[in-house]
Amino acid sequence: MKKVFYTFAGTVGVIAALGGSLAVWVSSQGRDDGATGRPSYGAYTFPKGAPRGGPIPRADGYVEGSQGSKFILPVMPPERAMDVHTAGSVVRNNEIRTCFWPGPKLRPGFYSTDPDGYGVENQLPDTMNTFTTAWFRIPEGAQIVMKGEYPHERHWSFTTYSTNGVPRDSIDDVQIDPDSGSQNPFREGVRRDVMPRRYTISIANGEPPAVRPPNTVYTLAPASAEVGMHMRNYVPDRSIDYLGAVSLPEVELHYADGRVLKGEDACSATAAPLRGKQVPLAVNPKVWQALTKLPWMNPAVGPAHAFESEPMEMFFNREYLMLKTFFPIRAFDNFAVQKGGFWSNRSTRYGYKYLSQEHGKVYAMRGKMPRTPRTWDGNPSPVSQDVDMRYWSICSAMAPPTGMTVDCVFDEGVVPLLDEKGYFTVVVSRAGDRPANATEKCGVAWLEWGNGDGIPGGSSDYGLIINRHTTVNPQFKYSWFAVTTPGRETSAMGAYAPQVINFHEKQRFEALGCPVDTAKIDKMPAQLAVQ
């Protein structure tokens, strides 16, 4: 065991040294290659602009942030009927904030075009989920107490984090006991429109005790340490606002001696350096670029490889992802442990696949759709417990160093498009390469690919797709939670593992007609392999 450890430590040391040297070299070569090979788009925000402002992107998306960061922003995807954030709602949503909760944040263009500003979520967000992020320090012996109403939405949770984005502790909607006389609308048999619906949650320093008190989230850090906490709000009913038609939780600071601070006083007593500011990037863009220039990598293509049909891959943790991406050595599979990263949360597991325009301009994802609730229209009936999971989505995204999402589709928008077998078909391409039959009318959901990795001087061909499974029913055995070994995605998930099929050009997909002949898609991999 020691020999293995020292071998690994030595390998990591060499990798770090090599990566550091290359990073210095790349920095010295830095230039703005943003326009090279990247498509130009007309819109990087809503028509009236982002409510928090920011720089005006160039035609290819290039911007310089308020702190000097340089990125290529993702194009604004077409607005859908079931979008949480629309041109008509973002200004109203932006006003929902307090001294403790700095307001909503999402991918660039929705609330800001400043990649260095709080309003941009830079950790590959799902666009059907709105983040509001609190940073705080809790004094010795004190607790933060939050009071509010359960929201009218699909899923809701609180997760604490380290300053580098590793999830620590969390509590989900169904776990939160209601106040006396109230009911929790996420629980079995309780109507979703029930009133009253109040709750109280505490945030405490340190580790949870052996017998954990109810409604308590822990920092897993010592007193006065800086801690972050995401409040996630998935799919509010009818998108009335990002909080699901309730107010932000009221915050109090309770000291051990009985003193209680509220409002601005509580905010001042818990102030932290990162409050209201952008969180640090999980991966340094210069290091990423350096790694793509390793001898066995193709900088133009990035981490993608050529394939005709393969399953999406399990995301285990940030460290293993970087090792697998740039140093695909099987020995590193020992580090494939489900612990998350990139500000992930414990209720969700993720699948992903790197793509490249160099290998194909049109890809299709196929798989069996898990059963999920229907809540968008404000269905007042109790949340169905007889489902496979609470939430499902597929998103297109840019590279981890920028952490920018391009586009997303979620379960309620995809279910009406399923074929007779209950399988979904999601196509990702650039708008100019979109097949004429990649439409809802033809039974297909479509995602905008975007304009590369988001890094000036990086890859204009880069693509990434991400599949989320959130709050999975323990009785459902075919989710991303079931994947414990790299390369065993299909054996663990069966038909629910999304297969990614490379159509190369839009004409091949258009040949499937309208409605799309999905039986031909399922036979396609073998046919493509011999062409």
Residue map of PLM features:
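N-terminal Sec-pathway targeting helices
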Residues: 1-14
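Prokaryotic Sec-type signal peptides and long signal-anchor helices
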Residues: 9-12, 26, 507
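A compositional/structural signature for long, glycine/proline-rich flexible linkers
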Residues: 34-531
